[in-house]
């Protein structure tokens, strides 16, 4: 396990109406990501049609230490079994954002997918995100690759 800087923690604030949902948590000792769950009404699940997108609320806000971000990543099981994934993977939650964390999902499968209250819909991963100095220059140093991209190094 990598060392977490002393005194740092990820703080979650529960939104009203979700006292029954667990705080995001790691499922196993070696898990890199913690589960994010759907905060939708019991009587109003989200039905995600094939090809459709939605914004699923989690019922939590988060405070992330400066210099870090929370990446919102797909759950591999949802992607494999149902074709449901995070549209903007990985989504980024900035350290200064304090609104409700929502997950942008898309159904790439062939059948409707129903998102119910408490379903694990994504995972959060905390990553370093320093703000580097951004400098405009006249020229960039040459590399062997140059401007080659999009398959230029082979398939």
UniProtKB/Swiss-Prot annotation:
Organism (species): Caulobacter vibrioides (strain NA1000 / CB15N) (Caulobacter crescentus)
NCBIfam families per UniProt: dut, PRK00601.1
Gene: dut
Binding positions for substrate per the UniProt entry: 75-77, 88, 92-94
Name this polypeptide is given: Deoxyuridine 5'-triphosphate nucleotidohydrolase
Entries under InterPro entries matching the protein: dUTPase (IPR008181), dUTPase-like (IPR029054), dUTPase-like_sf (IPR036157), dUTPase_trimeric (IPR033704)
Gene Ontology biological-process annotations: dUMP biosynthetic process; dUTP catabolic process
Catalytic activity: dUTP + H2O = dUMP + diphosphate + H(+)
Family: Belongs to the dUTPase family.
Pfam families registered for this protein in UniProt: dUTPase
Keywords annotated in UniProt: Hydrolase, Magnesium, Metal-binding, Nucleotide metabolism
EC number: 3.6.1.23
MF (Gene Ontology): dUTP diphosphatase activity; magnesium ion binding
CDD domains: trimeric_dUTPase
Cofactor(s) the protein needs: Mg(2+)
Class of the enzyme per the UniProt entry, highest EC level: hydrolase
The protein's annotated pathway: Pyrimidine metabolism; dUMP biosynthesis; dUMP from dCTP (dUTP route): step 2/2
Role noted for this protein: This enzyme is involved in nucleotide metabolism: it produces dUMP, the immediate precursor of thymidine nucleotides and it decreases the intracellular concentration of dUTP so that uracil cannot be incorporated into DNA.
């Amino acid at each position: 396990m990598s060392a977490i800087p002393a005194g740092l923690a990820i703080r979650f604030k529960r939104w009203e109406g979700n006292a029954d949902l667990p705080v995001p948590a790691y499922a196993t000792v070696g898990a890199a990501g913690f589960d994010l769950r759907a905060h939708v009404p019991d009587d109003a699940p989200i039905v995600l049609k094939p090809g459709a997108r939605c914004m699923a609320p989690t019922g939590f806000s988060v405070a992330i230490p400066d210099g870090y971000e929370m990446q919102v990543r797909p759950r591999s099981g949802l992607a494999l079994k149902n074709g449901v994934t995070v549209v903007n993977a990985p989504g980024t939650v900035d350290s200064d954002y304090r609104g409700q964390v929502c997950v942008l999902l898309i159904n790439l499968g062939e059948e409707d997918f129903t998102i119910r209250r408490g379903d694990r819909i994504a995972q959060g991963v905390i990553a370093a995100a320093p703000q580097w100095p951004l400098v405009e220059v006249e020229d960039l140093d040459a590399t062997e690759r140059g401007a080659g991209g999009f398959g230029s190094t082979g398939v």
